[in-house]
């Protein structure tokens, strides 16, 4: 059952300007693994990546209704890419399933996050087969 949907849009150039001006912005927003993936990218792809992660974390905060900082912090949310490029969101101490979509068009990035309550079968699957995930 879907329990939350969040959406966010950011101007990639604006996030790029923030990264250039505020040296600690990336450290405060991105986890170490996300920073590593970001630094593998060059030019506009670097800014798209950082803006996408920032936007996705904002969308997550909207989907939960918590905001960032109250119950969830920037580093509690990690979005890494699978080998095929699909972003996967993991949230510390969060018992619900999350889905994230990140898309870029021109100077904008748009993200959507969906939060779903797991069925009992899915929860048992995660408990007994944690590396395998949901059946």
Curated annotation (Swiss-Prot):
The keyword Magnesium applies. Signal peptide: none annotated. GO terms for molecular function: holo-[acyl-carrier-protein] synthase activity; magnesium ion binding. Transmembrane segments: none annotated. It catalyses: apo-[ACP] + CoA = holo-[ACP] + adenosine 3',5'-bisphosphate + H(+). Keywords: Cytoplasm, Fatty acid biosynthesis, Fatty acid metabolism, Lipid biosynthesis, Lipid metabolism, Magnesium, Metal-binding, Transferase. Pfam families: ACPS (PF01648). It is found in: Cytoplasm. Disulfide bonds: none annotated. Its cofactor is Mg(2+). Its EC number is 2.7.8.7. Mg(2+) binds at residues 8, 58. GO terms for biological process: fatty acid biosynthetic process. InterPro entries: 4-PPantetheinyl_Trfase_dom (IPR008278), 4-PPantetheinyl_Trfase_dom_sf (IPR037143), ACPS (IPR002582), Ppantetheine-prot_Trfase_dom (IPR004568). One of its GO terms (cellular component) is cytoplasm. The keyword Transit peptide does not apply. Belongs to the P-Pant transferase superfamily. AcpS family. Transfers the 4'-phosphopantetheine moiety from coenzyme A to a Ser of acyl-carrier-protein. This is Holo-[acyl-carrier-protein] synthase. It comes from Leuconostoc citreum (strain KM20). The gene is acpS.
């Amino acid at each position: 059952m879907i329990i939350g949907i969040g959406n966010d849009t950011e101007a990639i150039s604006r996030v790029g300007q923030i990264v250039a001006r505020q040296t600690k912005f990336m450290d405060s927003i991105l986890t170490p693994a996300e920073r590593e993936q970001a630094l593998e990218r060059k030019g506009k792809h670097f800014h798209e990546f950082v803006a996408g992660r920032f936007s996705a974390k904002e969308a997550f905060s909207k989907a939960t209704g918590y905001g960032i900082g109250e119950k969830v912090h920037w580093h509690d949310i990690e979005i890494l890419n699978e080998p095929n490029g699909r972003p996967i969101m993991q949230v510390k101490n969060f018992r619900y399933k999350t889905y994230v979509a990140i898309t870029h068009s021109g100077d904008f990035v748009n993200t959507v996050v969906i939060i779903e309550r797991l069925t009992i079968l899915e929860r048992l699957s995660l408990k007994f087969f944690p590396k395998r995930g949901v059946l």
